[in-house]
Amino acid sequence: PNMDRLVNQGMSFTQTHVMGGLNGAISQPSRAMLLTGRGLMDVHRNGQIIPKNEKTFPELFRENDYTTFGTGKWHSDKAAFNRSFSTGANIFFGGMHPYGNEKEEKGHRCPYLHEYDPTGKYKNGQWVNASLNTFSSELYADAAIKFIETNASNDNPFLMYVAFTSPHDPRNVLPDYGRKYGSKEITMPKNFVTQHPFDNGDLNERDEKLLPTPRVPEQVLAERANYYSMVNEVD
């Protein structure tokens, strides 16, 4: 309902499609394209680095006297983040949260996040001291809420960029709120096949590693149920 309300009160791009990527990361070039307005073949190194000549839209706001705030996933270079945002909190520069095993509380409950560093160094090991029981979405939402509350009475305009990492895998631990879907409520897509129908040059890349092949419908249904549950959790 909250996402629906944002759409109804704002703007929704209903004909937006992922163009693909030049490596296993699809979100990385998509993010760079969204930030710069460039196409897939025009973003630098699949979006790993956003050079100075490719201005991001937060940069343009910042140049026009907006306070720009960023929280959540970035997964491009740190210099571009600091050009784009004058401040931030609970920042994730990686591609995904760490996988764990049945005895470890990892994944979205163990995000490696940085506080905003004006120097742009963001050294590894200097993480936000967050409880392992705090889900990633809560950390990003709390950072955004705190920023709004701090700037509510400020006459200076601001732009806030909030990038949740859920429902990105690993989908290993769910928080105890929001509706949890059961696999019996989820249907398989009509185009489901147990494995890729032809050799595309790399049959063991990224999503193909999430589950063994040939795919078993029951496992796919469980994965899709977790995915929808995490979308509901973000909402």
Predicted segments with their positions:
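Formylglycine-dependent sulfatase
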Residues: 1-235
